[in-house]
Amino acid sequence: MTTAFTPYKATVLRAGAKGTAVKVLQAGLGGIAVDGSFGPATTARVVSFQQSVRLPGTRVVDRATWDRLELTVHPLFPYWGTVAKRGSSGANVVALQKALRITADGSFGPGTETAVKAAQTRAKLATTGVVATLTWRAIEKQM
C-alpha cells in the first residue's frame, strides 16, 4: 500500500528545496500555499507540525516527519491492507469503530456491520459490510 508520501520518505527536505516533494509536503501540511518552494511559510508550518506530533522542531523534513505526516493525513493507513468483517476482532476493528464514531469494543458485530454498510453506501461502494482497502480509504475520507 502506498500514499502520495511514499515516494518521498527517503527525501530530506529543508529551506530552499523546490519541486514535487515540496508540493506533496505542503499539501499534506495544509494551511499554506502549494507552490513547490520550501520557504519561510513552509518552514514555520513544518516546525508547528513537528511540535504538534511531539517531534523535535528541526525545520528539516526527514523520514520521521514524513511518517508522522502520512499517519496524520491517513490515520487508517496501517489497516488499508487488512480485511475486517463480522466476527473480526482486534486493533483494526477498534480503529474502524472509532473512525465510524461508534462504540469501540474491538468486536466486529452487527452494529459495526451496519455502520460499515452505511459508510459504503455514502461512498457509492458495494454494500458488503466487509472492510478492505477501498472501504478503509472511504471511511478515512468520511472522518
Show where each model-derived region lies.
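Cell-envelope/ECM-targeting effectors and their regulatory/trafficking segments
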Residues: 1-143
